[in-house]
Amino acid sequence: MTSTDGILAGKYPAKAHARRVVEYLRQNGFQGDGVLYLEAQKTRMIEDNDSEQPFRQRRFFFYLSGCLLPDAHLTYHISTDKLTLFIPPLDPESVIWSGLPLSPAQAKELYDVDEVLYTTDVNPTLAHLASKVGFVFAIDGQISDDVSLKSFPDTDKVALKTAIEECRAVKDAYEVAMIRKANDVTSQAHVAVLKAAKSATNERELEAAFIGTCIAQGCREMAYHPIVASGTSSATLHYVNNDEPLIDSSTNKKKLNLLLDAAGEYKAYCADVTRTFPLSGKFSPESREIYDIVLEMQTESLAMLKEGVLWEDVHITAHRVAIKGLLKLGILRGSEEELLEKRVSVAFFPHGLGHYLGMDTHDTGGHANYADKDKMFQYLRVRGKLPAGSVITVEPGVYFCRFIIEPYLKDSELSKYIDADVLEKYWEVGGVRIEDNIHITKEGHENLTTAPKTADQVELMINGS
């Protein structure tokens, strides 16, 4: 048994999370006793159909329960430190179709809670708690019509959501183990795609190889819709068609590269991994040049990562590496400082360096500022210093997207910084992105992603070595 498996053999630390949330509320002015109230996602039916929609648990509820059941509820009484889970009672009509549901006794063994009751006990329990305490925290829009909080003198429907969002930014050992597990499975799936690349003829075959491996290894859900982008489609950041042939019809040869941004989700926790590789098994000279720049962008960014580092500084470092590399190739002209000041590198690296990762792919607590007038930082999803315990993606890229770059070429001020003749050789490269998931520690960082990454490793894997 690995250390990850050993950690995950225990219960999800729901009560510790409840205590952390209360501590945050107290640090932000709440005093006295109170109750936290949360609801799971409801079972919903597909419109005009008798089948259920795919289920995705509410993350706020899961953080304080570890429970993936639909239609459940929870209460946490602050002064008694009592966490109660409410699960749906047995419905005889559904047993013939779905089997027996989890019993309260089974749920008590499975989850880190003090008591398990049926959902028919929600309102009586809330009324009893209201007779003892005056304050209940809930989330606006996540309170069922048949649930009454009116007996509480005071109700706050804002602070709890904020508190959980902020607490989620720092992961405990169990959460990191969940993300590591998702990464282990995801890395295996990336390897499966590398091995299938030479014989595949369409993007969808590689998507199938990825998803099939994830399911077989324990990640039944994808963290997000896979991006399987061949050829110049790799210049589109969130390409999702995944249905194009891998052969270029104009040359009858395989397209240069494939960008695979795909990851599994393990029990509500996500990975987020990107690799770019040559479909032929060998990078073209231009592709290899860009790949090496992007890998260096990531390498220098990773070297900076530790508790307290300013994420904006890491992002700027990645841009500096991109500028140096593109200057060396002759794509850019001018001085490094002038190119940085004019934000010319944003034409080739238009997105943020990364984002927090956890129960959501773009996890909470990043404090993005999409209204920032500085286009270098406008799409940076994390602002400020990185705390120990956070998990963040590091995903630099260089893209040759005509829609983004051509306005620079037409701009009388900015066009002088880009050599259009040299650039012409690189349009076919499309885009290169490399993405790993990094756990920030007090001493530095830990890379949770193990998928092959260097150009030589990738080529060897595709060619069966």
UniProtKB/Swiss-Prot annotation:
It comes from Talaromyces marneffei (strain ATCC 18224 / CBS 334.59 / QM 7333) (Penicillium marneffei). This is Probable Xaa-Pro aminopeptidase pepP. Its cofactor is Mn(2+). It holds the Pfam family AMP_N. The keyword Manganese applies. GO terms for biological process: proteolysis. Keywords: Aminopeptidase, Hydrolase, Manganese, Metal-binding, Metalloprotease, Protease. SMART domains: AMP_N.
